[in-house]
Curated annotation (Swiss-Prot):
This is Putative defensin-like protein 154. The gene is LCR35. Pfam families: SLR1-BP. The keyword 4Fe-4S does not apply. Keywords: Antimicrobial, Disulfide bond, Fungicide, Plant defense, Secreted, Signal. It comes from Arabidopsis thaliana. One of its GO terms (biological process) is killing of cells of another organism. InterPro entries: DEFL. Disulfide bonds join 31-78, 42-61, 47-72, 51-74. Residues 1-20 form the signal peptide.
Length: 78
């Protein structure tokens, strides 16, 4: 009887784990915006400061294409 209960417990934990992973995969409602896309370059300090103050988000400088100047990309909760 103890083996059956242990097996049921393991299956239950597996099901709960799968559902929690599926909920995380759906997304947490995060949005992305390019801050000042016409700027000639991305100053990481100014980029992060603008993102935090305007959107309460996280920012990084990312180039959209190889050879193009990086843009300030801000990710925040929608």
């Amino acid at each position: 009887m103890a083996k059956i209960s242990y097996s049921y417990f393991l299956v239950l934990m597996l099901v709960v784990s799968v559902f929690s992973v599926v909920e995380k995969a759906k997304g947490d409602g995060s949005c992305t915006i390019i801050i000042d896309p016409k700027a000639p370059s991305c100053d990481i300090i100014q980029c992060r400061l603008s993102c935090i103050t305007d959107y309460n988000g996280l920012a990084e400088c990312i180039a959209s294409r190889i050879g193009s100047p990086p843009n300030c990309v801000c990710t925040y909760d929608c």
